[in-house]
Amino acid sequence: MKRLTLLSLLLLFVYAAYSQHGPLQKNNIPLFGAQIFIEPGQSPELIDSWFQTLHDNGMNACRIRMFESYMLQADGTWDFTLFDYAFHAATRHNIKIYATFFPATEKTDIGGWKFPVDEAQKDKFARFIQALVTHYKDSPALYGWVLINEPGIDALPDTPFIRDSYADWKQENPSKEYKSNGYPVLMDTQKQKFQTDINTSFLRWIADEIRKYDTSHDVHVNNHAIFQNYGQYDFPAWRTFLTSLGGSAHAAWHFGYFDRQQYALAMLANAEIIRSGAGNLPWFMTELQGGNNTYSGLNAMCPTPEEIVQWLWITLGCESKGSIFWMLNPRSSGIEAGEWTMIDFQGKPTERLVAGKEVSQAVTANAALFREPHIIPSGIDVVYFNESLWAESLMAIKDDRYPGRQPGAVIKSPVACLRALTERGLNAGLKNINEYDFTQHDYSGKSIIIANQISIPAKYRESLETFVARGGTLLVEGLTAFFDEDLHNTMNTGFTFEKLFGGNISEFILKDNLFDVKANGHTLPTHLWYGHIAGQQDAVGVHTFGKGQVIWLPSTVALGAFVSGDYRPLSDYLVSVLPHSTSAISFDKHYSNMLMRTLKAGKETLVICINKSERQENVLLNNLPETKNRKIIYANTGCNITGDKLMMSPEGVLVVQL
């Protein structure tokens, strides 16, 4: 009897240790998994087989959409039986579950609602949160809660909840009729500001409701369509109620600004935005496209096994704690039925799942290396402003023949600069201006690029002046600061940045789809606009301010690279004029369609390189440390390292520990 009691206590201890996961930590080993789609009609045995498949293919996590519609009974109670099958199966196969709240909605609503219709629906959601959290919080399989599926929406719905919230918000944020200098305000971004704030406040409310009943598990959310929606996200504010940040990155839905060859670049930019947004929180890619499109997706595709591998390593190269694919098994009906999956209709693993397994195995075999690697900074950051996207949403012309006048130009420009630097092997950051640390006392050797950010509020003048005065280099490109926060052309009504930039614009001239601009001995392809700086003939103005300098190139050369596809001139120019780390590992020259991230893991250096070109590339590296302990972590056929040279096959990935 005593032996049984001791055994029972031991089992209880193991159960408790397993069930109390706590929030995701930055030093956790990365997780790999896939969404398991639960719906009526599935048997316990079928559900169990999917968790077995995950386990057998190197996966240790999954995400489940907790459909209230499949639980809610006529009397207002909830029957959790169907989802209990999944949690029991996850426990058996040692799979961690991220459970996504998906409150009752129309059966054709593929993504779920982002805001309640009214307070009554919000109250119902609160009761569902209570029921779901109290039912599953002690499950050993539960790892975390996803607040709601993919916050972010094209336009706010006209509902009582939104109308009432907007009325309250306007009391605290009244519109201006006139600026302080007497000019009228004819357009404003009040609705865009409100949408950002209501997103934050509603997500905070959900997190607070969860914490009433569960204070231990991870609280997470996944933004989506980042290149279109980033203006709706205030990541620094989200950090106050989340314990990890995530995102959805579906090439078919979200990468419409890019062609197929550029999807790896888009994934890198997406991951960098989330990494910066997470700050000190851990992050992982909550949804990563795993399978085929038949009738869903805006740009239908099926990822190749090579792309699956590339995307996983890209996110890991941006310090992610892993990725969860959308999805393992197919939904049976409606939009996306029979699509997106990592297994076939017979339940067998596809080549894509096997490819993911190989990456998972490589990480697991080198777990210590991937616990908490840190990107080795180049000293260069590309920053963007939400206000520029807000302005573009009001000014751009969707069907215009010129990309620079269409939606997307204000994010394509920063991404073009990111690509130009990445193709030199440099770790450039991509972050919101509010995520940059302006509290340092010395910015010598640091550079900020502001590329075609058409609206910059006056409140950022002091931070940017501080950065430059303390030794930083600021490169300003394109139509940056054309508008202020009130959509006033400040170059006409009093230029806020005249002291910092060292002048004002005489005029912007629309010249051609593509033309050349000469800058510091470089000939740069330029799209649409040439900016004349008042009082000078050169295309570039260089102004010393305090201990630093401002390089002002008011022509849209980043869009020129994006539109022409020729990034070498922009890359050569940026590297020649911007201070950056001279000791960091980098390429000896520009290599088109070559991506690299270098990280530090303790005393070890980790190099992740991806060749998206169509030919074999032999890449020479600068500043490679001398070591006899090189170890290949992962390599496609035709990829290797010899001396200071990387041999990279087309579509190949090479991961090396130095």
State what each model feature region is:
Residues 451-658:
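A conserved amphipathic helix/loop scaffold
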Residues 220-222, 228-415, 506-509, 528-530, ...:
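Hydrophobic targeting/anchoring helices
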Residues 417-441:
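A short, well-structured beta->alpha microelement
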Residues 47-120, 197-214, 455:
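Aromatic-lined substrate-binding rim segments of carbohydrate-active enzymes
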Residues 32-42, 67-80, 110-126, 151, ...:
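The substrate-binding groove and active-site-proximal loops of carbohydrate-active enzymes
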